[in-house]
Amino acid sequence: MSLELKIEGMAELQAALRKASAEAQEAVGVAVIGTAMELRGDIVKRIQGGPASGAVYTRGGVSHQASAPGEAPASDTGRLAGSITFDKTGPMSATVGSDLVYAAALEFGSGRIDPRPAWVPAIEKITPKYIARLEKALGSSFK
């Protein structure tokens, strides 16, 4: 599963990147990579440590309290949190994702389960910081 972060004014940003110095382009790369790493960490933290006020059930003699609808998924086996990956895909690009099919079902809901969002709230939280990092990296060429 992966979500894309769309930036309004992308054409202007791309034009600024083409004009930017090598140092500014490197700084943008650092901003992108740092933000992606931080985003991954926040998603994992939400899954591992978020509130769990849903149903309690026992499986294999071990009891687990699930998350309630609207809460981040409550970690059970650790498989979901462990599946969250960060990859640098280029000098100024990165992805954060999960290869688990049920990651999307938990985030957005499915026919059997209400949404348990962790990704969207994490993206919403980090977006202002990401924009500030890009502005700082590009300096006056971004304005």
Language-model segments: residues:
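Short, Lys/Arg-rich flexible segments
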Residues: 1-143
